[in-house]
Amino acid sequence: MDPTSPKNLLVDPGRAREVLSAFSVDPDRPLLVQVSRFDPWKDPFGVIDAYRIVKAEYPDVQLALVGSIALDDPEGVRLLDDLKGAAGGDPDVCVLSNQDGVHAAEVAAFQQKADVVIQKSVREGFGLTITEGMWKARPVVAGQATGCRLQIEDGRNGYLIASTEECAARIVQILSRPDVGESLGREARETVRRRFLSTTHLARYLSLFAQGPMREPEV
């Protein structure tokens, strides 16, 4: 992950609040965020179901599903429309895309203000949006897909879940115990710093090159 990318830079807290407010999201209420393509493999409908379970215990909770969509992607357009229908007019569910003016800086603001970052993927390679949330020191709740397991050590720097009910339970745990969320977030950021930053890997390559050419083995 490139830490100098606009999506990975720290957003001024006041500006982050303004971004959320511009999309009718209350920055003073709990917020769940999933950033992903509008793709069935990301299980966005499962995220909405988990949100509804959480809302029974935390009526003030909000959900933002944030993604990008291409005009020549009819399946993505249909899924976006279906998601808005699944929200059922709930004013606390926000489904946003680049067509709404959500770009890198806005995505960063949503991730930074999230109380919980969700990545409920059924299938996932290396989840860059997981890393982005971890780098912002947010607690991440993710599915059991292979890429998620490469990034998250369950219970140490995030949570891995196998069902909608487990997803909701972990979210409730984080909302009820802010200290748990803070601890997970700290470990998550440190994990990214050590393992997933492009600058860290570049420094390691430079250190290797500085050692000079490798000697040919003697025969």
What are these regions (language model features)?
Residues I130, P139-A142, L160:
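Short hydrophobic beta-strand element within catalytic cores of glycosyltransferases
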Residues G67, L71, G76-A109:
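Nucleotide-activated donor-binding/catalytic signature segment of Leloir-type glycosyltransferases, i.e.
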Residues S21-K42, I48, A64:
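Conserved donor-binding/catalytic core segment of Leloir-type glycosyltransferases
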Residues D154-E165, Q173-P178:
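Conserved acidic donor-binding segment of nucleotide-sugar-dependent glycosyltransferases
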Residues D115, A137:
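A short alpha->beta transition loop at the rim of the catalytic pocket in nucleotide-sugar-dependent
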Residues A108, T131-W135, T146-L150, R156:
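Short alpha-helical segment that forms part of, or immediately flanks, the ligand-binding pocket
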Residues V122:
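Aromatic "clamp/platform" in nucleotide-sugar-dependent glycosyltransferases that forms part
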Residues V180-R195, H201-S207, Q211:
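A short, well-ordered alpha-helix in the C-terminal region of glycosyltransferases
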